[in-house]
Regions:
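Acyl-donor binding region in acyl/amide transferases
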Residues: 13-83, 87-104
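Terminal substrate-recognition subdomain of acyl/acetyltransferases
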Residues: 1-12, 67-157
Length: 157
């Protein structure tokens, strides 16, 4: 496991694939500013996810067939497709892992929202893309990430 950014963790490459995960409960607890609004927190989390994704792209730019895969309830399908991801059916093993981690998901979502929040497991999607398709969409990813960072800077000034 490797931190690609504050809230994005990647597994070691295996069978030409890297699986990505959101940060841990400790990451959320110790990183999120207690005085930040829910919107600021969500923008920071999304910004860091994209920053981590861009770091993976930069680190593996020569392996165009390398696949990146992850499951989330945070990213909507339309945005994921703009970034070069395809939607895949979440496999049963991954769904069971998410169900077992549901208390942790409640805590991380609640930290982000600044109130008790329950993730909807029906909204979980698995996204997959290779480095080539992500590189083709890198400008879009950077544009979204920069907009989130600008929004954070504006809110903190």
């Amino acid at each position: 496991m490797k931190y690609e950014s504050l809230f994005l963790i990647s597994e070691k490459e295996k069978n030409n694939q890297i699986t990505i995960h959101g940060g841990t409960l400790f990451d959320y607890y110790f990183t999120l500013n207690k005085n930040s609004s829910a919107k600021e927190r969500k923008n920071l989390i999304l910004s860091e996810y994209l920053k981590g994704l861009l770091h993976i792209l930069d680190s593996h730019k020569d392996n165009l067939s390398l696949e990146i895969i992850g499951s989330t309830y945070i990213l909507n399908q339309r945005t994921a497709e703009k970034m070069g991801f395809d939607v895949r059916k979440t496999n049963m093993v991954q769904l069971i892992i998410l169900i077992l981690n549901y208390p942790n998901l409640i805590c991380t979502k609640s930290f982000a929202s600044k109130k008790l929040s329950f993730p909807n497991l029906k909204e979980i999607r698995t996204y997959k893309a290779n480095i080539q398709s992500l590189n083709n969409s890198a400008a879009t990813i950077r544009k979204i990430q920069n907009a989130l960072e600008r929004n954070l800077s504006y809110q903190n000034s």
